[in-house]
């Protein structure tokens, strides 16, 4: 329970207020985490409402299974499986989808999960430690080119090539030093390469973010779930997404803008704009944590919440 108590759900009231438009509707929490949003949604639902939550983390599933509410069910899988998982339950349309992206505080704060450079632990970084390739396993085989691309594209790290070369050089010493399999050593290697410091940021921040995103396929899964949410939302249904870094937010912003804009019409063609299909989404708002929330929970500082509504059947 300690981690659950320490974890503070970001933009809790604002997200649920924006999401729940019909108390008797069917809602999806794509990232259960420690259940802050899910519990708040359930508190707003009528007896006929339903909430289906998703999470890859076995510990999140354990927490979810303690919720004794007939209106609630949990799916141990990525939110990228949302379309198929709901179809298997006979659900074709939902009243709202909530996505709280990124890694949760309990995951970061547990050195055994391998997400943090602040405490030494096994180099894992998987949201679900029972599935897929760990960070250490990927680092043991990735080429300089692949490492460079991941660290550059997912970490927006300008020293990506130098870090990649240092990681491959360390791998060449595995017979003498053993495998690179701890967060502490990874952070140390990056720190030797990245000499400049961003204010308030550890030199390893961008590299750890990049490797975590790659290992968990976070951006690919995000694109899949956005497409699924668009097709699942009923008319008037809401899509609410909380992002914590620019890569995620850029994808969400572009997705919402693309589906809230009417298609361009070539003036040379005999087509009137009014004759074209209406865009399926309407952008409702963009919100940020209040100053008071950031003071109480510094990890909320980088959060941005975007809300869109389905306006076509």
Curated annotation (Swiss-Prot):
Top class in the EC scheme: transferase
EC number, as in UniProt: 2.1.1.199
GO MF terms, alphabetically ordered: rRNA (cytosine-N4-)-methyltransferase activity
Binding positions (S-adenosyl-L-methionine): 35-37, 55, 79, 100, 107
GO biological process: rRNA base methylation
Signal peptide from the UniProt entry: none
Cellular component annotations (GO), alphabetically ordered: cytoplasm
Catalytic activity, as annotated: cytidine(1402) in 16S rRNA + S-adenosyl-L-methionine = N(4)-methylcytidine(1402) in 16S rRNA + S-adenosyl-L-homocysteine + H(+)
Keyword list, A-Z: Cytoplasm, Methyltransferase, rRNA processing, S-adenosyl-L-methionine, Transferase
Main subcellular location: cytoplasm
Subcellular location(s) per record: Cytoplasm
Record-linked PANTHER family: 12S RRNA N4-METHYLCYTIDINE METHYLTRANSFERASE, S-ADENOSYL-METHYLTRANSFERASE MRAW
Role summary: Specifically methylates the N4 position of cytidine in position 1402 (C1402) of 16S rRNA.
UniProt family annotation: Belongs to the methyltransferase superfamily. RsmH family.
UniProt protein name: Ribosomal RNA small subunit methyltransferase H
Organism: Burkholderia ambifaria (strain ATCC BAA-244 / DSM 16087 / CCUG 44356 / LMG 19182 / AMMD)
């Amino acid at each position: 329970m300690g981690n659950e108590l320490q974890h503070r759900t970001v933009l809790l009231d604002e997200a649920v207020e924006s999401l729940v438009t019909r108390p008797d509707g069917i809602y999806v929490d794509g990232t259960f985490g420690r259940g802050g949003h899910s519990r708040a949604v359930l508190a707003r639902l009528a007896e006929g409402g339903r909430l289906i939550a998703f999470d890859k983390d076995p510990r999140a599933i354990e927490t979810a299974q303690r919720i004794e509410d007939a209106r609630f069910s949990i799916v141990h899988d990525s939110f990228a499986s949302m379309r198929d998982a709901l179809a298997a339950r006979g659900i074709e349309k939902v009243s709202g989808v909530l996505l709280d992206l990124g890694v949760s505080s309990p995951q970061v704060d547990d050195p055994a999960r391998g997400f943090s450079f602040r405490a030494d632990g096994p180099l894992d970084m998987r949201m679900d430690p029972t599935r897929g390739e760990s960070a250490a396993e990927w680092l043991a085989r990735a080429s300089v080119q692949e490492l460079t691309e991941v660290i550059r594209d997912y970490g927006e790290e300008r020293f990506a090539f130098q870090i990649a070369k240092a990681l491959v050089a360390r791998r060449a010493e595995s017979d003498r030093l053993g495998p690179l399999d701890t967060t502490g050593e990874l952070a140390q290697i990056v720190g030797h390469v990245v000499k400049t410091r961003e204010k308030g940021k550890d030199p390893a921040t961008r590299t750890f973010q990049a490797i975590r995103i790659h290992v968990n396929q976070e951006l690919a899964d995000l694109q899949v779930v956005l497409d699924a949410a668009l097709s699942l939302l009923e008319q008037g249904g809401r899509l609410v997404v909380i992002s914590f870094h620019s890569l995620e937010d850029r994808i969400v912003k572009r997705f919402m803008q693309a589906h809230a804009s009417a298609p361009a019409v070539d003036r040379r063609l005999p087509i009137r704009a009014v004759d074209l299909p209406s865009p399926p989404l309407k952008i409702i708002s963009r919100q940020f944590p209040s100053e008071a929330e950031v003071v109480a929970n510094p990890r909320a500082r980088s959060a941005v919440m975007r809300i869109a509504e389905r306006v076509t059947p």
